Regions:
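N-terminal lobe of the biotin/lipoate ligase/transferase fold
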Residues: 1-163, 167, 193
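Catalytic beta-strand/loop module used to bind and position nucleotide/cofactor moieties
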Residues: 2-19, 113, 119-121, 129-139, ...
């Protein structure tokens, strides 16, 4: 990883140096202790300013060390991008999952909306339908708390979040598309010609939170986000019915995007997601999310196969026309155009050669 010198940071980072335990008996450990010296030399933090860990201790239900970044004024006349993180970013060591840590923090009133957790690695990471997510060090394993407002409160939530993330990554220089409803793909040259590979995934979970002090009980909505930066699951661990092979977000030999530390990339991504939400969705009205998601929708205009039901026995083939207002996939065939709210999507045949 290289030093994150191409952009500046504004925001608060909190290191969970003593680890995190569940709020309920038997208080299982959710994240291992992550001392400052360990964190500073880890893939999670490598490349960011060393001064970030000359920080005071803070005593809370989930103790952390805190650093507030203020982007310095440029003395050279250059104006690098400033990543302004809208809420605290928590860094933790090896965890059961970043989503577990996020729920524990939220239960203690320590994770506001747009706050996030970034784990060094995961022991029990999970993907769609509860599938195990391979989680060694060096990749992004994050959880982001979302507002419980449109479009995140209904069936459009998954493609809306996917569109936001794809838009943010594209702005950062990564050519990423969303495979409905919650996979992140990029194009890749393969032996048989141009193809797709999966570089990340998104999992949404909404669960009730217990009341905290004066705060009434509420539901917690969290997006689990995984991105393959340095490693991807081997083919033997991928399910047989996978739509595309696994791959990396970028390759040093095939991309002009400068590599970032894991934490640096995540902070920049959160900054872009929040900016995009405010400018592209919140400010433009009810269905603005749909235009954004369709802009990055993989397989658009191509013949696809949608499978659903037990053992994926239900099969629907058609031209992918886009999304409906509820986040459903719109397929057109000789019988007309229909919308589907669930299923696994793949190309029905290889894409045409250019």
């Amino acid at each position: 990883m290289t030093h994150d010198s191409t952009f500046r940071l504004n925001g608060m980072v909190r290191l969970l140096h003593e680890g995190v335990h569940s709020e309920r008996p038997p208080h299982d450990r959710l994240a291992d202790p992550f001392p400052a010296d360990h964190a500073a030399g880890s893939a999670l933090w490598n490349g960011l300013p060393e001064a970030a860990f000359t920080i005071p201790g803070t005593s809370t239900a989930c103790p952390y060390l805190e650093q507030f970044f203020t982007a310095p004024v440029s003395q050279t006349g250059n104006t690098p991008e400033t990543a302004s993180v809208p809420a605290p970013v928590y860094l933790c060591g090896s965890a059961t999952s970043s989503m577990d840590v996020a729920r524990a923090l939220a239960a203690h009133g320590q994770l506001p909306v747009w706050g996030s957790v970034l784990a060094l690695s995961q022991r029990s990471g999970r993907g769609q339908l509860g599938r195990n997510w391979v989680s060694p060090e060096g990749n992004v394993y994050a959880a982001l708390r979302l507002p419980r407002s449109h479009p995140f409160t209904g069936t459009a939530a998954a493609p809306a979040v996917g569109g936001l993330i794809a838009e943010a990554l594209t702005h950062m220089g990564f050519d990423v598309h969303m495979k409905w409803p919650n996979d992140l793909l990029r194009r890749e040259e393969q032996e048989e010609g141009p193809g797709w590979c999966k570089v990340g995934g998104i999992l949404l979970e909404e669960r009730p939170l217990p009341p905290h002090r004066e705060t009434p009980a509420e539901n917690l909505l969290v997006a689990g986000i995984g991105l393959n930066l340095v490693s991807s699951p081997p083919a033997a661990l991928m399910r047989a019915q996978r739509a595309v092979p696994a791959g990396l977000l970028s390759s040093a030999t095939k991309s002009n995007v400068s590599p970032l530390s894991v934490a640096g990339l995540w902070m920049r991504l959160v900054s872009r997601i929040f900016f995009c939400y405010v400018e592209e969705i919140d400010a433009k009205g009810k269905n603005a999310w749909r235009s954004l998601a369709e802009r990055h929708l993989a397989f658009l205009g191509q013949t696809v196969l949608l499978t659903d039901g037990p053992d994926e026995q239900e099969r629907h083939t058609g031209i992918l026309e886009g999304l409906d207002d509820f986040g459903g996939l719109r397929l057109r065939n000789r019988k007309g155009t229909n919308s589907f709210l669930s299923g696994s999507l793949r190309l029905d045949r290889p894409p045409m050669q250019p």
